[in-house]
A protein has these predicted regions:
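N-terminal cap/lid segment of alpha/beta-hydrolase-fold proteins
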Residues: 19-43
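Mobile cap/lid helix-loop segments that gate and shape the active-site cleft of serine hydrolases
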Residues: 26, 169-206, 212
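C-terminal catalytic histidine-bearing segment of alpha/beta-hydrolase fold enzymes
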Residues: 33-36, 91-98, 231-286
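Short beta-strand element of the alpha/beta-hydrolase
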Residues: 45-53
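Catalytic nucleophile-loop/oxyanion-hole region of alpha/beta-hydrolase
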Residues: 60-67, 83-124, 263-267
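Primarily recognizes the serine-hydrolase "nucleophile elbow" in alpha/beta-hydrolase
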Residues: 110-180, 198
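Short beta-strand/loop motif that positions the catalytic acidic residue
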Residues: 210, 215-218, 222
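Conserved alpha/beta-hydrolase "acid-adjacent" motif
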Residues: 223-232
């Protein structure tokens, strides 16, 4: 039977099971961000932190979270589904963060770096990240900005993921191809017009030669995130010589994750293509 455990189980080394662990528990950070582990039978091939999408305002906890974790575990990976901080439905509706504050950059990447740190402290194998839509922007941010410890608590634990898989990702914060809702969710009300911030979080501008290998997927008919986002990232990865594989499907749409009910004939292949890719890559730790 597939075991669904949490990082807390690994940390405490007990037979107690809890479905989630609060990643900031015991720190001065007041956030409810959580991590749930889906573990394979036997030694994992690698660990993958999974970041669901949701425009940086909410999260698709099932199709891009739970189902992804279950699938990865069934294929021999230790999957850790991260419920990171988002702007939230209230702030999406009422635009209150400009006055009262709330979750915004760098809260999201701090959560992902914290998750990578906690997993690495318990597991010495490869640790990567997979994200969907806005979650794709988040995991690619981790692949580019690992030189900055947004958690202020890594204490020497490497923050660079060993591989990343942005799936139909948001990439740019620049017009005209940005996903405006994700930009607002990430930057926060009152900062969306700040061109310096837009540029600093437009990932096509910050690819590093030492960024980890990338599995990139996009669909030509994506009605939510302009697929040109992925094209910009693909070009930047090529320019910097970063090992990557880009998968382009003519028909697939957006938001399918690991939900087979949303697959097209083309997107039904994406999981197998990811498994083929990860079996071939050189993790090339730095």
């Amino acid at each position: 039977m597939r075991r669904i455990l949490t990082l807390l189980f690994l940390v405490l080394g007990t037979a107690l099971q809890a479905q989630t662990v609060k990643i900031w528990e015991g720190t001065s950070v007041h956030a409810g961000s959580s991590l749930t582990a889906y573990l394979p039978e036997g030694e994992p091939k690698a660990a993958v932190v999974v970041c669901p999408g949701g425009s940086y305002f909410w999260l698709d906890k099932e199709g891009e979270g739970e189902l992804v974790g279950e699938w990865l575990a069934s294929e021999g990976f230790a999957a850790y589904v991260l419920l990171y901080r988002t702007g939230g439905w209230f702030n999406f509706t009422f635009h209150t963060r400009a006055v009262f504050g709330g979750n915004r950059h760098p809260d999201m990447i701090a959560d992902l770096q914290r998750a990578i740190t906690l997993v690495r402290r318990q597991y010495d194998g490869p640790v990567g990240a997979m994200g969907f839509s806005a979650g794709g922007h988040l995991v690619m941010s981790a692949a580019e900005f690992f030189g900055t410890d947004f958690t202020e608590r890594a204490a020497g634990t490497p923050l660079r993921p060993d591989f990343v898989a942005p799936i139909y990702p948001v990439v740019s914060m620049r017009d005209p191809c940005t996903h405006a809702r994700s930009r607002r969710g990430l930057l926060g009300d009152g900062r969306t017009g700040n061109q310096v911030m837009r540029d600093s979080l437009s990932l096509e501008c910050h690819v590093r030669p030492d960024s980890p290998p990338v599995f990139l997927l996009r669909c030509d008919d994506d009605p939510v995130v302009d697929p040109h986002n992925a094209d910009l990232l693909d070009a930047a990865l090529t320019e910097k010589g970063v090992p990557h594989r880009t998968i382009r499907y003519p028909v697939g749409g957006h938001g399918f994750g690991a939900n087979k009910e949303k697959f097209t004939e083309e997107t039904a292949r994406w999981q197998a293509e990811f498994l083929d890719w990860i079996a071939e890559i050189d993790y090339g730790r730095h």
